[in-house]
From Swiss-Prot:
Cofactor binding, note field: Binds 2 Mg(2+) ion per subunit.
Residues given in the record as Mg(2+) 1 binding sites: D7, D141
Residue positions binding Mg(2+) 2: E68
EC code(s) of this entry: 3.1.21.10
Record text on subunit structure and interactions: Homodimer which binds Holliday junction (HJ) DNA. The HJ becomes 2-fold symmetrical on binding to RuvC with unstacked arms; it has a different conformation from HJ DNA in complex with RuvA. In the full resolvosome a probable DNA-RuvA(4)-RuvB(12)-RuvC(2) complex forms which resolves the HJ.
GO MF terms held by the record: crossover junction DNA endonuclease activity; DNA binding; magnesium ion binding
Protein name: Crossover junction endodeoxyribonuclease RuvC
GO CC entries: cytoplasm; Holliday junction resolvase complex
Major site of localization recorded for this protein: cytoplasm
Keywords: Cytoplasm, DNA damage, DNA recombination, DNA repair, DNA-binding, Endonuclease, Hydrolase, Magnesium, Metal-binding, Nuclease
Function field: The RuvA-RuvB-RuvC complex processes Holliday junction (HJ) DNA during genetic recombination and DNA repair. Endonuclease that resolves HJ intermediates. Cleaves cruciform DNA by making single-stranded nicks across the HJ at symmetrical positions within the homologous arms, yielding a 5'-phosphate and a 3'-hydroxyl group; requires a central core of homology in the junction. The consensus cleavage sequence is 5'-(A/T)TT(C/G)-3'. Cleavage occurs on the 3'-side of the TT dinucleotide at the point of strand exchange.
Location in or out of the cell: Cytoplasm
Species per Swiss-Prot/TrEMBL record: Koribacter versatilis (strain Ellin345)
């Protein structure tokens, strides 16, 4: 299965596509980030995210896309900006005819690190280890996107095994 993870951010929106082979080994297909300039108007930032995510989806053909659930931020303005980015990311996914799976941040960290309150550096290190990457993914948004994809792969594999036993 090939899964794209997206980590929505107002400065960087990370993306990563991870594939699980028939032996459940994980492989990083592509990873990167859409860098957004603080000087650009919001509508230009959102258009850039939309275009670049659509391009990655069309080029690498994931079967499903996973995104983190909305979390509650202390700063309402920041939460609103992230909501815009998340909405545009979901629109890009829908435009490409794919479905979106969502996961709570605690679930992502638990699936990748084994601890729901893991630090960013722990997530980055574990993502690099699980994907056999030569270095830790940077910026952290890229590692987070890969972690979201890994979370979906682990979760769907567990659900498949559970249904097979039933």
């Amino acid at each position: 299965m090939r899964v794209m993870g997206i980590d929505c951010g107002s400065e960087y929106t990370g993306f990563g596509i991870v594939e699980s082979d028939d032996r459940a080994r994980l492989h990083c297909i592509v990873a990167g980030a859409v860098h957004l300039s603080a000087r650009d108007p919001l509508e230009n930032k959102l258009a850039k995210i939309f275009r670049e995510l659509c391009s990655v989806i069309r080029e690498h053909d994931p079967e499903v896309v996973a995104i983190e659930d909305v979390f509650y931020a202390v700063n309402a303005k920041s939460a609103l900006k992230l909501g815009h980015v998340r909405g545009v990311a979901m629109l890009a996914v829908a435009e490409c005819g794919l479905r979106v799976a969502t996961y709570a941040p605690l679930a992502v960290k638990s699936a990748v690190v084994g601890y729901g309150k893991a630090e960013k550096c722990q997530v980055q290190a574990m993502v690099a280890r699980l994907l056999n990457l030569p270095q830790v993914p940077e910026p952290a948004d890229v590692a987070d996107a890969l972690a979201i994809a890994i979370c979906h792969l682990h979760t769907s594999a567990t659900l498949t095994r559970m249904h097979a036993k039933a």
